[in-house]
Amino acid sequence: MEKLRRVLSGQDDEEQGLTAQVLDASSLSFNTRLKWFVICFVAGIFFSILGTGLLWLPNGVKLFAVFYTLGNLAALASTCFLMGPVKQLKKMFETTRLLATIIMLLCLVFTLCAALWWRKKGLALLFCILQFLSMTWYSLSYIPYARDAVLKCCSSILS
């Protein structure tokens, strides 16, 4: 129906870019997007909690780092279903979120490196904590004035 509307209004498919054509062809309904958002978000919470539970097992730091990182990636991917992957990536790298995004992604990678390759448990835990803090700071950027409120709260506690 959309193609018919474009043809009738004088717009050709050739005017539409390749990316727009691909996104048009693979777009999901709102209900489907909402369902997959919930599935990914719940999976992210589940993996994060599972990873936290595995932390207390002998040699569980590796599993903790993997599952905690997998949980954060699933939670991050869940928002791609709500706003679309291209829009999500554009928003992630806006100037207001750029630093938080870079730190978050680096912490995701360094958590896995510390746990799996470097075999440094303390470093893996440190990167998981930094991963949590950077993910929280990144998430707060979507709520108007939330970062300012957190900064004021922290500064009043520290002074």
Swiss-Prot record:
The keyword Iron does not apply. Pfam families: Got1. GO terms for biological process: protein transport; vesicle-mediated transport. It comes from the Eukaryota. One of its GO terms (cellular component) is endomembrane system. Residues 58-62, 119-122 are lumenal. It is a multi-pass membrane protein. It is found in: Membrane. The chain crosses the membrane at residues 37-57, 63-83, 98-118, 123-143. The modification Phosphoserine is found at S9. The keyword Phosphoprotein applies. Its main location: membrane. InterPro entries: Vesicle_transpt_Got1/SFT2, Vesicle_transpt_SFT2. Residues 1-36, 84-97, 144-159 are cytoplasmic. May be involved in fusion of retrograde transport vesicles derived from an endocytic compartment with the Golgi complex. Belongs to the SFT2 family. This is Vesicle transport protein SFT2A. The lineage of its organism: Eukaryota, Metazoa, Chordata, Craniata, Vertebrata.
